[in-house]
């Protein structure tokens, strides 16, 4: 994928002879592991911790310089071999070619006219690198013993990639040689480039990604040096931080979920050829054909010969694109910023508000999102704000009053306010909250635009400033939208306009409504941030059903490395193991990891 593929040429053909002892690196990684396993820093201390971790990582990188396995020549020199290998193994290679589109990097260009919805690309399972193929590879024995590898498919896939890269006769060599030698994910940012993200909503995920990656490397360095099942791994004599950073970046920018062979569950996969497609706005047009056992992609739109072929990666924010894919997408119609909100337990009405929220399937405290498009808030956030601003009498009506179920049902529907006063309160609150968030940035929108226009910036610095600017523009838009809504509902209240009343006959209208905010909360496929997704049973059920039904790759099925999903679930477990390792545990086995 081109924007994820802005790379330098690769340098050498084999790993160099080690000039530093494993024991010396083991001591440094133990120190790194201990640092990365310490409790989360307090407010305002994250940058300090990041700098300390980075200092240790740079010390390790300096000692390991020149030890990584890379390839001779330019990346594009290996494209003919990739196409030949793909063709010989049943993939489609007609109708497109790989081309450097400069700003977007490498991508696919149509060599003939392709019609919208035409099947133009398919890749059989045989060519995919998956968690299943990792289990059946040289990594298998260690995988069977290490709980982290078993629980975190993205890490297993990263090690699978490293082991195959270090094996000259690997079946996947033509694919691996065509991958970038470095990426534009924040793992590759210089410290000054990361500094541009200070005070942004995204910086916390950047810190988390860096810390988790460093911790994982330190943990697995010891595993590879001491575990008996790691003796035969081709990484035994050379496993550098540079290697691991490259592998996790390759996986996080390319991984997707596909069904297992029997279709009973999903697994993570790297998909050659298809992963060269760049992103644009649209709909997901890639799926998995279980009958033919292959990944298939149909054209998003008409593509004329000579035009770049785009696909839609999914409804991701620019923060997600920058952090997990290494690019910023201008005019992202799905861009959004996080906003953390919660009902205080000291609130006199906390118990009642918590009960109403529970009936609507919403947690009392969570991460929501403000959106780039109108309306700036989703049905879920609207419902939360309505409950947050309810009076005691309004809460009673939603718990005990007539039509209480209907009232819960319409909480997320903009057509049915709780009261005019409630609407004024919630939009006033949102306006104030977004205004406060804007004040936390160290630069203004105008200053960011000036820097982008008048300074010679690196690609990564440009991405960081664009992300910072984008967050502020969304917040500013939310402030203006909230102010307009506040005044509208204040006028309704002053004029004592009658409140719209919900009736069952309204249901058809609600279901056919275009605007997301008009849909009743319980009918809506909520599109919120990861923290909210995990807290909502409704969303979880819908997502799982869709993944199972479609067997889809791309879109929202990706599991990025280090900031959420599997990693968050395993932080406690991994930390426990990490602390044990840092203390110098003599056990060679990782069986001690508690689930």
From Swiss-Prot:
Residues 10-20, 584-595 have a biased composition (Polar residues). Its main location: cytoplasm. Residues 94-314 form the SET domain. Disulfide bonds: none annotated. Its EC number is 2.1.1.85. Gene3D superfamilies: Rubisco LSMT, substrate-binding domain, set domain protein methyltransferase, domain 1. The modification Phosphoserine is found at residue 513. This is Actin-histidine N-methyltransferase. The gene is SETD3.
């Amino acid at each position: 994928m081109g924007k994820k593929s802005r790379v330098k040429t690769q340098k050498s053909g084999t790993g160099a002879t080690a000039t530093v002892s494993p024991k010396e690196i083991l001591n440094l990684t133990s120190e790194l592991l201990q640092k990365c396993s310490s409790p989360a820093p307090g407010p305002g201390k994250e940058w300090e911790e990041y700098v300390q971790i980075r200092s240790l990582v740079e010390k390790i990188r300096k000692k390991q310089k020149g030890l990584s396995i890379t390839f001779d020549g330019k990346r594009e020199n290996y494209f003919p071999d990739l196409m030949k290998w793909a063709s010989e193994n049943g993939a489609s290679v007609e109708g497109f070619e790989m081309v450097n589109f400069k700003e977007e990097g490498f991508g696919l260009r149509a060599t003939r006219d392709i019609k919208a919805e035409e099947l133009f690309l398919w890749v059989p399972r045989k060519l995919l690198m998956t968690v299943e193929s990792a289990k059946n590879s040289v990594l298998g024995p260690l995988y069977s013993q290490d709980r982290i590898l078993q629980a975190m498919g993205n890490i297993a896939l990263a090690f699978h990639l490293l082991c195959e890269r270090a094996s000259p006769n690997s079946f996947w060599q033509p694919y691996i040689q065509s991958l970038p030698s470095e990426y534009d994910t924040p793992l590759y940012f210089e410290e000054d480039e990361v500094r541009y993200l200070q005070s942004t909503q995204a910086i916390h995920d950047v810190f988390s990604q860096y810390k988790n990656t460093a911790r994982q490397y330190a943990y697995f360095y010891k595993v590879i040096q001491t575990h008996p099942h790691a003796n035969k791994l081709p990484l035994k004599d050379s496993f550098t931080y540079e290697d691991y950073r490259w592998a996790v970046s390759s996986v996080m920018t390319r991984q997707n979920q596909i069904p297992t062979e029997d279709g009973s569950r999903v697994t993570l996969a790297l998909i050659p050829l298809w992963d060269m497609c760049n992103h644009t706005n649209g709909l997901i047009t890639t799926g998995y054909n279980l009958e033919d056992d292959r990944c298939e992609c149909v054209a998003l739109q008409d593509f004329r010969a000579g035009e770049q072929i785009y696909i839609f990666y999914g409804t991701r924010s620019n923060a997600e694109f920058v952090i997990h894919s290494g690019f910023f997408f201008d005019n992202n119609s799905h861009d959004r910023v996080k906003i953390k909100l919660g009902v205080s337990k000291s609130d006199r009405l906390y118990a009642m508000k918590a009960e109403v929220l529970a009936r609507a399937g919403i947690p009392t405290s969570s991460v929501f999102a403000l959106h780039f498009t109108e309306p700036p808030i989703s049905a879920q956030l609207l419902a939360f704000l309505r409950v947050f601003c309810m009076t005691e009498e309004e809460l009673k009506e939603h718990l005990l009053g007539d039509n209480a179920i209907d009232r819960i049902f319409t909480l997320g529907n903009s057509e049915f306010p709780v009261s005019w006063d409630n609407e004024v309160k919630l939009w006033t609150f949102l306006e104030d909250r977004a205004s406060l968030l804007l004040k936390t940035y160290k630069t203004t929108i105008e200053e960011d635009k000036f820097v982008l226009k008048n300074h010679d910036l690196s690609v990564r610095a440009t991405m960081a400033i664009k992300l910072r600017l984008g967050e502020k523009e969304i917040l500013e838009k939310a402030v203006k939208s909230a102010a307009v809504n506040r005044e509208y509902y204040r006028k309704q209240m002053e004029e004592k306009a009658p409140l719209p009343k919900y009736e069952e006959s309204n249901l058809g209208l609600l279901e056919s409504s275009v605007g997301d905010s008009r849909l009743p909360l319980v009918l809506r496929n909520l599109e919120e941030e990861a923290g909210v997704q995990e807290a909502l049973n409704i969303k979880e059920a819908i997502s799982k059903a869709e993944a199972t039904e479609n067997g889809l790759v791309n879109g929202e099925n990706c599991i990025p490395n280090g900031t959420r999903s599997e990693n968050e679930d395993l932080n406690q477990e991994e930390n426990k193991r990490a602390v044990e390792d840092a203390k110098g545990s003599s056990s060679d086995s990782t069986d001690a990891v508690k689930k």
